[in-house]
């Protein structure tokens, strides 16, 4: 399951506060961040997710996306997790780009805490395996550096995202780059670099499913 983070339109419906799990309440969804040049996160994640889906399908994988287009509203973060749960997804990858400090660059991976009450038995442990494999493989395939502002490129014990909190199986979020950094913004806007990012995600997921 690939989850292209955020959506195009920011209407009152996505500002509704929902229970995002683990005691977290937040907006149903948002439009995300953007580069200083105006390239939006939702467009980046949609493009990368579709590129990764094509690569995975070429390898024979069955791939679902949590939203059908880049022109609508939603779905809510709660619904995105539900889509993965109902599909009994072997892995749930939430694809994002960060809006971090302008002086920071690189990617990082977010993983749930061991005590996540929503995961199936072993799901949290498998999420940590998925996070480690994606962290190492994405770096090796893309050559992109680990985040300079998130230690080691890991955000452990994350409870800030609804998809991580509410997913039952292996789940991570990958923040592929920092859109507020000029160098990373140039990568985000380059189709060839987005293809490289998709290849890194594909390789990480394939490696995890082979473990």
Regions found by a protein language model. Name each.
Residues 39-211:
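Active-site-proximal helix/loop segments of hydrolytic enzymes
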Residues 4-48:
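Active-site-proximal loop motif in hydrolases
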